[in-house]
Design a protein with these regions (language model features):
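Short, solvent-exposed amphipathic alpha-helical segments in soluble enzyme
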Residues: 21-25, 64-65, 127-128
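A conserved FAD-binding loop/helix module that cradles the flavin
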Residues: 49-92, 96-98
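Generic structural motif recognizing short loop/turn segments at the entrances and edges of beta-strands
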Residues: 22, 29-31, 83-85, 107-109, ...
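Short, solvent-exposed loop/linker segments at the N-terminal edge
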Residues: 101-106
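A structural detector for beta-sheet-dominated domains
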Residues: 36, 90, 100, 114-116, ...
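A Rossmann-like FAD-binding core segment of flavoenzymes
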Residues: 1-17, 107-128
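Non-transmembrane, interaction-prone segments in cytosolic or luminal domains
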Residues: 42-43, 63-64, 70, 74-76, ...
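FAD-site-proximal beta/loop scaffold in flavoenzymes
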Residues: 4-56
Length: 128
């Protein structure tokens, strides 16, 4: 893309026609774009957040993602790139999906996840 732009959309279900037009990889579980911890897709300079990634229960989470995306996009513009995110986030059968799908392992980051069913007295283990 030879231009900068900001596209805002309001809706619940991920619609990714623009993502597909740009060759962005979609996640089979979320039906949204795959992103790294900076909310950058697998296409450098193309970022995604909110319901275009996965359905959110609260707009607060969309706002938090958008804030992180804005910081990341500004860093990308300033530095010309972001740290490589080559660690794939994998889940077991009890977790439907996570966002992001890739992390760097060099910075703290937040993982959003959706479980397949409600759990009681459970423990979440994150390891590398």
């Amino acid at each position: 893309m030879d231009h900068y732009g900001l596209i805002l959309s309001v809706g619940l279900i991920p619609e990714n026609e623009l993502s597909l037009d740009e060759g962005v990889t979609l996640d089979a579980r979320t039906k949204g774009a795959t992103v790294d911890e900076y909310f950058q897709t697998d296409r450098p300079g193309i970022f995604a957040a909110g319901n275009v990634l996965h359905v959110h229960d609260l707009v607060d989470f969309v706002s938090m993602e958008a804030e992180k995306l804005a910081d990341s996009a500004a860093r990308y513009i300033k530095e010309g790139k972001l740290p490589a995110c080559e660690i794939q986030v994998k889940t077991d059968k009890n977790i439907n999906h996570t966002v992001p799908q890739r992390i760097s392992g060099t910075e703290d980051c937040c993982l959003s996840l959706r479980v397949n069913r409600p759990f009681k007295d459970c423990v979440l283990v994150v390891s590398h």
